């Protein structure tokens, strides 16, 4: 009898590994195809048609005098909605309201409110919004660190914690409490809660800010599950860097768009995504950072980056 070749000797379990490989390849192929189809649905076919005066004559925007908030106010006015602008500075509110009224020929209303002082404002805001048919609420107002910092070394820590929680968390809950009943009564409405990519995973040295934005994301997705069957859409918007004063970025780039470019893109995702990065390059970054990069690696990279930013800030401060 001829001696069997080693290649002909069966290896236990080799067929199992082959089948597992086929299953894995098919699974990854289907997942990639689904991502491409879903991406085309959102980024190519999305039109944002759900957002406009047909769901309510008025839109309410917090943090409305600069950056993303101002861009939302302008884009919603461009779509024919009257705008309630809520922010801290009466002078800036008057200026932005005048610009919007003259440019888009819509009605405007202003409410000056410091969201860092919650006991003083919500009764006044409720009175200011009474009897308005509010179709859209944009919870945009927010505050971050002056620079990346270790938790216990944050300047004026006790007051900073109160301020950040009141502005980034309490405002979202309270404004939703004021506006949602009217939307439910009419069976339609859109609430856009501006979170941050910093809320997608912990960001060291911006820990409190990151945690507040994670709250906004979870709050939004939970509310969407509760109220979507009643005609109200709640969306969590998680931008990466946008060229705003808050981000301290002056010049827009392809991955750091102007607020206007970002908002036009983000509004096109309403009704298509409950949780959105709002802008195609940001969506790609979000997919990479959550699907391909382990959370532990993302945290380590965030720590390294923010330690560098902190060192540069402190060096400049020392030179002044």
UniProtKB/Swiss-Prot annotation:
This protein's membrane topology, according to the annotation, is:
Multi-pass membrane protein
Which terms does the record give in the GO molecular function aspect? estradiol 17-beta-dehydrogenase [NAD(P)+] activity; very-long-chain 3-oxoacyl-CoA reductase activity
Amino-acid positions noted as binding substrate in the UniProt annotation, renumbered to this chain? 196
Q: What is its main location?
A: endoplasmic reticulum
Q: Does the keyword Isomerase apply?
A: no
Query: Enzyme group, top EC level?
Result: oxidoreductase
Q: What does the UniProt keyword field contain?
A: Endoplasmic reticulum, Lipid biosynthesis, Lipid metabolism, Membrane, NADP, Oxidoreductase, Steroid biosynthesis, Transmembrane, Transmembrane helix
Do you know which Gene3D superfamilies this protein is assigned to? Answer: NAD(P)-binding Rossmann-like Domain
Q: Known EC number(s)?
A: 1.1.1.330, 1.1.1.62
Catalytic reactions on record:
a very-long-chain (3R)-3-hydroxyacyl-CoA + NADP(+) = a very-long-chain 3-oxoacyl-CoA + NADPH + H(+); 17beta-estradiol + NAD(+) = estrone + NADH + H(+); 17beta-estradiol + NADP(+) = estrone + NADPH + H(+); 3-oxooctadecanoyl-CoA + NADPH + H(+) = (3R)-hydroxyoctadecanoyl-CoA + NADP(+)
Q: Which PROSITE patterns match?
A: ADH_SHORT
* Pathway this chain belongs to: Lipid metabolism; fatty acid biosynthesis; Steroid biosynthesis; estrogen biosynthesis
What residues form the catalytic site here? 209 (proton acceptor)
Q: Which domain of life is it from?
A: Eukaryota
A GO BP entry:
estrogen biosynthetic process
Q: Cellular component per GO?
A: endoplasmic reticulum membrane
Amino acids binding NADP(+): 56-85
Q: Which residues cross the membrane?
A: 17-37, 189-209, 283-303
What the protein does? Catalyzes the second of the four reactions of the long-chain fatty acids elongation cycle. This endoplasmic reticulum-bound enzymatic process, allows the addition of two carbons to the chain of long- and very long-chain fatty acids/VLCFAs per cycle. This enzyme has a 3-ketoacyl-CoA reductase activity, reducing 3-ketoacyl-CoA to 3-hydroxyacyl-CoA, within each cycle of fatty acid elongation. Thereby, it may participate in the production of VLCFAs of different chain lengths that are involved in multiple biological processes as precursors of membrane lipids and lipid mediators.
Q: Which family does the UniProt entry place this protein in? A: Belongs to the short-chain dehydrogenases/reductases (SDR) family. 17-beta-HSD 3 subfamily.
What is this protein called in UniProt?
Very-long-chain 3-oxoacyl-CoA reductase
């Amino acid at each position: 009898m001829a001696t069997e070749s080693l290649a002909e000797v069966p290896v236990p379990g080799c067929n199992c590994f082959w089948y597992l490989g086929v299953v894995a390849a098919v699974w990854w192929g289907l997942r990639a195809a689904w991502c491409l189809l879903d991406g085309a649905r959102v980024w190519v076919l999305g039109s944002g048609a759900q957002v406009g005066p047909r769901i309510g004559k008025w839109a309410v925007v917090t943090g409305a005098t600069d950056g993303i908030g101002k861009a939302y106010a302008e884009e919603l006015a461009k779509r024919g909605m009257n705008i309630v602008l809520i922010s801290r500075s009466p002078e800036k509110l008057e200026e932005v309201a005048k610009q919007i009224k003259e440019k888009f020929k819509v009605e405007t209303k202003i409410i000056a409110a410091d969201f860092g002082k919650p006991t003083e404002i919500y009764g006044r805001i409720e009175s200011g919004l009474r009897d308005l048919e509010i179709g859209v609420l944009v919870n945009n107002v927010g505050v971050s660190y002056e620079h990346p910092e270790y938790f216990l070394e944050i300047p004026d820590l006790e007051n900073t914690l109160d301020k950040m929680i009141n502005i980034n968390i309490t405002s979202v809950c309270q404004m939703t409490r004021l506006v949602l009943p009217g939307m439910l009564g009419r069976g339609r409405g859109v609430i856009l809660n501006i979170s941050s990519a910093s809320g997608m995973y912990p960001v060291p040295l911006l820990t409190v800010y990151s945690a507040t934005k994670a709250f906004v994301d979870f709050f939004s997705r939970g509310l969407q599950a509760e109220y979507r069957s009643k005609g109200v859409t709640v969306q969590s918007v998680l931008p990466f860097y946008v060229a705003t004063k808050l981000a301290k970025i002056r010049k827009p780039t392809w991955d750091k768009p102007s607020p206007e470019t970002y908002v036009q893109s983000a509004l096109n995702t309403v009704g298509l995504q409950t949780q959105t990065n709002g802008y195609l390059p940001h969506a790609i970054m979000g997919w990479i950072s959550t699907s391909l990069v382990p959370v532990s690696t993302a945290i380590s990279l965030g720590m390294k980056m923010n330690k560098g930013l902190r060192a540069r800030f402190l060096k400049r401060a020392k030179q002044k």
